[in-house]
Amino acid sequence: IFGLLLRKVAVSRFTGTLATLIRSGVPLLQALKIVESTAGNEVFSRVIRDAADGVRNGESLAEPMARSGEFPSMVTRMIGVGEKTGALEIMLFKIQEFYDSEVRALVDQLTALLEPVVMVFMGVVVGFIIVALFMPIMSLSSIV
């Protein structure tokens, strides 16, 4: 579950940062270099570096990303459509929006799963403290 969460956060961060840079007028290769350095994930940094090399060699951005297998196919297809229609930044923002909502939903699920676990753990700790307090008293009463 945590791996899935980290992957979705990385995709959201990548698409949002790249979209913002493109909207600001930064050329694609330079934007990819900046995004690579801010990825915060070595696997995604490598994929972004490979994608930049592919773009430099005349490929579309979506092709090397799809080959890597690290990005979901929906992401690479939407990026491909954005490149073909000239609306790459819009598609990137839509991907970011989708993955932000996915991350929120996953965090809510994790929170709902962790609450009972924390309650049981706290019950065990309190029980242990109570037993630790009463054991000496019980042993003293058996001596008398």
Task: Report residues per predicted region.
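Bilayer-spanning, highly hydrophobic alpha-helical transmembrane segments
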Residues: 101-144
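Residue-level signal for pocket-adjacent positions within structured domains
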Residues: 1, 60, 66, 135-138
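Membrane-cytosol interface motif
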Residues: 1-7
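Glycine- and small-hydrophobic-enriched helix-loop-helix hairpins
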Residues: 7-113
